[in-house]
Amino acid sequence: MSTLHKVKAYFGMAPMDDYEDEYYDDRAPSRGFPRPRFDDGYGRYDGDDYDDPRREPADCPPPAGYRGGYAEESRYGAVHPREFERPEMGRPRFGSWLRNSTRGALAMDPRRMAMMFEEGHPLSKITTLRPKDYSEARTIGERFRDGTPVIMDLVSMDNADAKRLVDFAAGLAFALRGSFDKVATKVFLLSPADVDVSPEERRRIAETGFYAYQ
């Protein structure tokens, strides 16, 4: 359509049917093959050719897990636990254990024990008292006043009464010019003034534990 004809049609000098717009006649060239509306593109692929990215390849080996303590395994073989070598530990012998545990009263030579308390030795008259409560303090005082060495075994007493009896014995030994010594836990030796007990003899008394059998 010429420009002159367009002007005539605009002012009504030419019929409108003759007006043709090149815009409407222009068609874009067809590219490729026709596609239906809302084509998602999946119709062009066959089911066998489609690879799901979430699916692992069939020929890939399974992921290796933690193999601590297990031997190497084949691809489809069973898992066998690895055998660890255990160090051999020596078993304690009953005889050696008995020899090592022989201490205290059993470790003391009975002959040495008899020599220490033989006739004429200051400790030959020693006596052991095991008071149950503080009311037996009178018996301890009487034995000590008569010149007899006294061992007080306070193991069976509660701490409160044992403390009172220790204070009483310490005051008694001080008043009569004797000595008051600790032999073992909650075990004390009261020695009169004419009985001299050396540290070695106190150690032997503790080691022999003879007061536990009197």
Curated annotation (Swiss-Prot):
This is Cell division protein SepF. It comes from Mycolicibacterium paratuberculosis (strain ATCC BAA-968 / K-10). Residues 36-58 have a biased composition (Basic and acidic residues). Belongs to the SepF family. GO terms for biological process: division septum assembly; FtsZ-dependent cytokinesis. Cell division protein that is part of the divisome complex and is recruited early to the Z-ring. Probably stimulates Z-ring formation, perhaps through the cross-linking of FtsZ protofilaments. Its function overlaps with FtsA. It is found in: Cytoplasm. Residues 23-70 are annotated as: Disordered.
